[in-house]
């Protein structure tokens, strides 16, 4: 199936967080200029037809009450984990549902740490991670990313190791591609 990645959508005036308001700064572009929303992981291409079809089918039911996740939801995750990561024995009861990345991060942080625990996060960092740690009462310990001689962002493994040991850290957040620098981490 081919997808449309070339149509430019004008999302201004449609409650688009990426285009209608630039948070954190209070600054709006001067008249005649546009902002490029590099601060948010929001895609501006047309949604894939199967996604639109599924949403439209769901909207045919005029009630949006609570729903149960279908078997296909769990099967797709189990198959993806098996094929992509070699995970065997994953069961539906091992899979949770989250509405977004930050909800998932919050659930994981609250499941494996306690308020006051220190969490390792690379900086620069996505402000959503910062707010989630603050909201859950965790303490951020930053490990600064370093640029190599080619200008590529790299993790500083010595710094990470030292901070993990010195701060008795048992939980770290890795973001790939890294937000905000866009670096996709290699598998070693």
Model-predicted regions and their roles:
Residues 2-6, 10-100, 107:
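N-terminal small-domain helix-loop-helix segment of the aminotransferase-like
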Residues 64-188:
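Conserved core of the PLP fold type I
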């Amino acid at each position: 199936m081919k997808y449309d990645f070339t149509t430019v959508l004008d999302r201004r005036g449609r409650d688009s967080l990426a285009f209608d308001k630039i948070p954190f700064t209070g600054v709006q572009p001067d008249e005649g200029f546009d902002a490029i929303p590099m601060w948010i992981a929001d895609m501006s291409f047309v949604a894939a037809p199967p996604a639109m079809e599924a949403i439209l089918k769901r909207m045919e039911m005029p009630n949006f009450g609570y729903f149960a996740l279908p078997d296909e939801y769990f099967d797709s995750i189990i198959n993806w984990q098996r094929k992509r990561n070699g995970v065997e024995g994953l069961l539906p009861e091992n899979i949770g549902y989250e509405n977004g990345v930050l909800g998932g991060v919050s659930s994981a942080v609250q499941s494996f740490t306690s308020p006051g625990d220190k969490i390792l996060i690379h900086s620069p960092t996505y402000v959503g991670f910062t707010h989630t740690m603050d909201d859950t009462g965790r303490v951020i310990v930053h490990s600064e990313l370093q640029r190599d001689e080619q200008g590529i962002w790299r993790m500083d493994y010595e710094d990470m190791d030292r901070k993990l040991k010195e701060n008795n850290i048992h939980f770290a957040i890795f973001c790939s591609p890294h937000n905000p620098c866009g670096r996709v981490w290699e598998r070693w």
